[in-house]
Structures are given as structure tokens and as C-alpha cells.
Amino acid sequence: MHPRFQTAFAQLADNLQSALEPILADKYFPALLTGEQVSSLKSATGLDEDALAFALLPLAAACARTPLSNFNVGAIARGVSGTWYFGANMEFIGATMQQTVHAEQSAISHAWLSGEKALEAITVNYTPCGHCRQFMNELNSGLDLRIHLPGREAHALRDYLPDAFGPKDLEIKTLLMDEQDHGYALTGDALSQAAIAAANRSHMPYSKSPSGVALECKDGRIFSGSYAENAAFNPTLPPLQGALILLNLKGYDYPDIQRAVLAEKADAPLIQWDATSATLKALGCHSIDRVLLA
């Protein structure tokens, strides 16, 4: 079991501990539960889906990286496939506060970058901030997404974001988590190709500035993040954050990164290079390359 889970695991009910122990035994537990695993946990504990998600939130929150706030938020995004995806907030010392990742963004990106097609619900241990409510409104589930909070009845996103502004106001038809392929040729080594593939999946209807980041760890594992724009602009999630979300949730740490590649267009209206390289250097990665989409 990864050490970060030990305290939260010890506080779970005995029957949930017994059912989870073989799942968490792998140090690189992928911070997700398949539909089959969810069904098994429900049978072992007698909990329904909502109660089980609440019970698992401490494990999601244990994935948080909060050196500034020490305020750990966990989220679980429930995909239409039946898979549940953990998420947690992340803060980066030496970077800017604008690089911060919120738990809801983490769980949603985890699902999206894992190939999930849409979300049914998200469970969070604290009420979503306005930034996250706006981020969720970019999803193809839209205002129907169900939000579950401890001690409250579940409500749709529309109840938390009345009179919402979103992609439909800008006549955007392709939404976040819809399948997209921008068709750039995969060239270069494996890491460069991973970054280009991530750029091909970008959701960037507002700036038309595709980008993707791929991180290579010392053991050869590669984590890729795609750019995810938002109708309100500021809640946009950069591609580096997508890759860092996966790296963190899958049990790796920043010193494990040995090389990074950013893929973007040289003449794009928005350029990721400066922010990406500055944040990576703050995390200790200095081997950073850029490949141009063509």
C-alpha cells in the first residue's frame, strides 16, 4: 500500500478495509475503481453507491499535495462506464497560485484522460468553489451532472450554478469529454509522440491552440496531459496539470520525472511554453523539450 493511504485506510470500517486491502496492496494503485470493483465493495459492505463514495473520500483526499494550504480536498468522479476516478487538489511550491489544481478538476481530468466518455456524478468532501462549478459546466454532461456533498441531498450542477454561462452561449457544440482528434502526425521518439497524441485530444474551441504534455519517469512510465479550455477562460486547465494529475494519482512523485515534452503550434494564439517550463523547473525537472505541431 502506498504510504499516503495508511492513515485514511486505518479509519475505514472493518468490512471496507477487508474488501479494499487487496486493491490497495499495489504501491501504484491507479486511484480508480472499475465497475466490477465498485460492485464488489458494495456487496462486501452493504453500502449503496452514494454511501460508498462518501466512505472512500478520505482515500481520495489522501492523494492531495497541499504544501501551502494544508487543506486536503478529495473528489470521486463516477463515469458512465461504471468506473470511479479519484481526484485531489495540488499546489506547487515555487510556481504561481494560478498553477493550482482543484480536486474536482483532478477527478474530471483523471476520467477524461483515462478515456471515459461522460460523467454521471461527482462526490466531493467540501462544496465546490465557483471556479470548479464553472469548470464542470464545460463537460458534455452539462448542468445535469449530479453533485454529492456530505450531509446534503444530491443536487444537479444547475442548482449550484444558476443562470449559468457556458459553451452553449458561445455556440460551442463539441464539449469537454467528447471524443476529439485534431489529426497532427505522430513524429519523433515515444515521449514526443505521447505529447502530440495528447495535443490531438485537446479541448480548445476558443483559442484554437492545441497542446499536450508528456512526462517520462525514471522507470520509463509516461504520463500525458491534454489542454482543456473553458468558456470562462480562467478555469482552463493547462496540459502540464493534466499530466501532473495522473503522475500524482498513480503513485509517482515529482523527483521521478526525468524528462518532459510539450507539443504545441509555433504560431498559436496562446503559447504554453513559458508557464510549462517554469512550473517544471520549480518541481525539479530541467530536461524539457518542445515539439511543434504541423
UniProtKB/Swiss-Prot annotation:
Tell me which residues bind Zn(2+). Answer: 102, 129, 132
Provide the binding site for substrate.
89-91
Domain CMP/dCMP-type deaminase: from-to ranges: 48-168, 186-294
Give the GO terms filed under biological process for this record. cytidine deamination
Q: Which reaction does it catalyse?
A: cytidine + H2O + H(+) = uridine + NH4(+); 2'-deoxycytidine + H2O + H(+) = 2'-deoxyuridine + NH4(+)
What SUPFAM superfamilies does the entry give? Answer: Cytidine deaminase-like
Q: Which InterPro entries does the UniProt entry name for this protein?
A: APOBEC/CMP_deaminase_Zn-bd (IPR016192), CMP_dCMP_dom (IPR002125), Cyd/dCyd_deaminase_Zn-bd (IPR013171), Cyt/Deoxycyt_deaminase (IPR050202), Cyt_deam_dimer (IPR006263), Cytidine_deaminase-like (IPR016193), Cytidine_deaminase_bacteria (IPR020797)
Molecular function terms from GO: cytidine deaminase activity; identical protein binding; zinc ion binding
> One matching Pfam family, short form?
dCMP_cyt_deam_2
Q: Keyword Iron: yes or no?
A: no
UniProt KW keywords: Hydrolase, Metal-binding, Zinc
Cofactor binding summary note? Binds 1 zinc ion.
Q: What does UniProt give as GO cellular component?
A: cytosol
Per its UniProt record, what PANTHER family does this chain match?
CYTIDINE DEAMINASE (PTHR11644:SF2)
Q: What does this protein do?
A: This enzyme scavenges exogenous and endogenous cytidine and 2'-deoxycytidine for UMP synthesis.
Q: Which family does it belong to?
A: Belongs to the cytidine and deoxycytidylate deaminase family.
Q: How does it assemble?
A: Homodimer.
The molecule here is called Cytidine deaminase
* Encoding gene, per UniProt annotation: cdd
